[in-house]
């Protein structure tokens, strides 16, 4: 889902808000959010079909507070608190955290960059997710590019460099990524994230690398989970095209790959954790059409392992076609259809080779 995109807008002060308070000439606090709900029919082969309300068909629902203070001499303090929720039930997206999407404070200077401390998106996730064209629920870029999916790390320090002729670099380190809260540093899962971005008008190019140091690696782990991503997009005005490639090793660095074999870590299948590799490709196209756009996206993830029954793991493919219609700068109607092979909503790779289809429509409102 394109959560990081909207979070970045909010952090930059570009998102419309229902409340914006200026405490004095150099301080501001802003309330912002997204409410997205729709109706969808989902079918998984071998499991049947399900219809009902869909939370976040286009973008996950969230609300947040962000603020800045001018400290003088080019320095500024900033913060962001962001929480996801389900509008179909009114419940929090994460019952264990008040601000699951973000809770950080930082200092920034035009000459020295932006330093942020707290729970936040990694540099790799932020840069990689910007290449996504179609963010449909469970069938966006994150379905195959797990290092660009919607995940955050706790106890993290991120630094983003100043912009220089279109280039920006970022580096991040999480001292306790999944909140194990052990006293000794090496008893906690740590993460490092690096990224380089180039942006010049219609052109965007990114490269990222991330690695996890697990506090307690699973038995027969093939090494530290890591992910490398590279891609670019170009807006030709009549069409926008996005291309990306990713290589993931030894499990998912975002701890967001499910737990089909009971490893208890969200690293994905045991065969992947035990030295497996996944290569993924993505092609996305956006074509303006009236007050909206037609969105087409295809991605493929190719694993290199065999399942316990000796069968070779098959490629997972996700293809979507959708349309967004802007009723106003804040409100968007949308409709989409998606098909995924060898993929379920719970697991990126399915030993049973299940196929998933989804058709949905809804409304997304930003405030």
Language model: regions and residue ranges:
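Outer-membrane beta-barrel "beta-signal"
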Residues: 354-367
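Cleavable N-terminal export/targeting peptides
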Residues: 1-26
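Repeated loop/turn-to-beta-strand initiation elements of outer-membrane beta-barrel proteins
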Residues: 75-77, 113-115, 166-169, 202-207, ...
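Gram-negative outer-membrane beta-barrel proteins
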Residues: 39-47, 85-91, 123-127, 177-181, ...
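Residues that define the transmembrane beta-barrel architecture of outer-membrane proteins
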Residues: 51-61, 98-101, 151-155, 188-192, ...
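Outer membrane beta-barrel
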Residues: 23-42, 51-176, 188, 197-204
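Transmembrane beta-barrel strands of outer-membrane/channel proteins
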Residues: 35-39, 79-83, 119, 171-175, ...
